[in-house]
From Swiss-Prot:
Keywords on record: DNA-binding, Magnesium, Metal-binding, Repressor, Transcription, Transcription regulation
Residue sites binding Mg(2+) per the record: E181
Record feature DNA-binding region, as residue ranges: 33-52
SUPFAM superfamilies the UniProt entry points to: Homeodomain-like, Tetracyclin repressor-like, C-terminal domain
Entries under InterPro entries matching the protein: Homeodomain-like_sf, HTH_TetR, Tet_transcr_reg_TetR-rel_C_sf
Single GO MF annotation: magnesium ion binding
Domain of life from the UniProt record: Bacteria
Self-association state and partner proteins as the record states: Homodimer.
Residue intervals of the HTH tetR-type domain: 10-70
Record protein name field: HTH-type transcriptional repressor AcnR
One annotated GO biological process: regulation of DNA-templated transcription
Organism (species): Corynebacterium jeikeium (strain K411)
Keyword Transcription among UniProt keywords: yes
Length: 189
């Protein structure tokens, strides 16, 4: 049996997660049958579930990967910057569709909700760490608590998610995000 390089293995996992994201976003968790996953991903069930033991693990890994990406963007660009990047993204439909399905699963599956909450905590901490750094550098207001600013940003994220989930489009979002950013900045920044 030929040895598969770590690079090839990583590429296969990326392909599987990308295809699974599209399938879950298109059909929902329940509608993403194994046959649909195979068709969308372009790999056999054996190849898919060799890496991810079952559909639950695959869904959780896609959700985890999306949250990791969001936390990475938030660490680099702030939460508003992360929202901007995602809104401009080519895979926007799949990302937002997956996010809607994650929200649905959180509401009906306590086990999934508990695992998802761990990823949410990581994002929350990333956002708060970035806000503390921004405050220390004088870029954001000092007259509002960090927790209040963080909750405001989380509400903005959820509002954008809701708007996009309802297919209301992105028109005007950039201006709204500019407004939120300017409201949080220190005078002169």
């Amino acid at each position: 049996m030929p040895k598969v390089s770590d690079t090839d293995l990583a590429e296969r996992k990326v392909e599987i997660l990308s295809g699974a994201r599209h399938c879950f976003a298109t059909y929902g968790y329940d509608g993403a049958t194994v046959a649909r996953l195979e068709e969308t991903i372009g790999k056999s069930r054996g190849a898919i579930f060799h890496h991810y033991g079952n559909k639950d693990q695959l869904f959780l890994e896609v959700a985890h990967e999306d949250m990791r990406k969001m936390a990475e963007l938030a660490a680099d660009e702030g939460l508003i910057g992360a929202i901007r990047t995602l809104v401009k993204s080519n895979d926007l439909t799949d990302w937002w569709g997956m996010r809607v399905e994650i929200t649905r699963r959180v509401n009906i599956d306590p086990c999934f909700a508990a695992k998802w909450e761990l990823d949410q905590l990581a994002l929350r901490e990333t956002v708060r760490t970035r806000l503390r750094e921004q405050r220390a550098s004088g870029r954001i207001r000092k007259d509002v608590e960090i927790e209040t600013i963080a909750q405001t940003l989380e509400l903005v994220l959820e509002g954008v998610l809701g708007r996009l989930a309802q297919r209301q489009g992105t028109e005007g979002l950039s201006d709204a995000l500019d407004f939120v950013e300017s409201a949080l900045r220190s005078p002169g920044h």
